């Protein structure tokens, strides 16, 4: 499924705007949630540095990870008409 995240573009980093070395990032991680991220369109495109390099890459930076999870949760609630409780039923946690 295509992403439902507003402002995401497969050709540039969602966080910094770089246009080289772009990678797909599943907003909600873990085996089950990764598949759910794909199912519900909760992915963004990040450059390699914002995705997977310390200290600011989302896989190393809790603040950035939480920010993307909040954006993802809000997008899912808007797109699918979910309440916070309904989102929590699917992804196991509220990030707002």
Give a label for each model feature.
Residues 18-23, 52-55:
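Short functional micro-motifs and their immediate structural scaffolds
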Residues 21-35:
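Short recognition patches in nucleic-acid-associated and regulatory proteins
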Residues 1-12, 35-41:
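Short, charged surface segments at domain edges that flank catalytic/cofactor-binding sites
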Residues 20-23, 42-46, 72:
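Amphipathic alpha-helical interface surfaces
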Residues 70-96:
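Short flanking/linker segments adjacent to small metal-binding domains or redox-active Cys/His motifs
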Residues 43-68:
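Short Cys/His-centered divalent metal-binding micro-motifs
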Residues 13-16, 47:
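Short cysteine-rich clusters marking metal-coordination/redox-active sites
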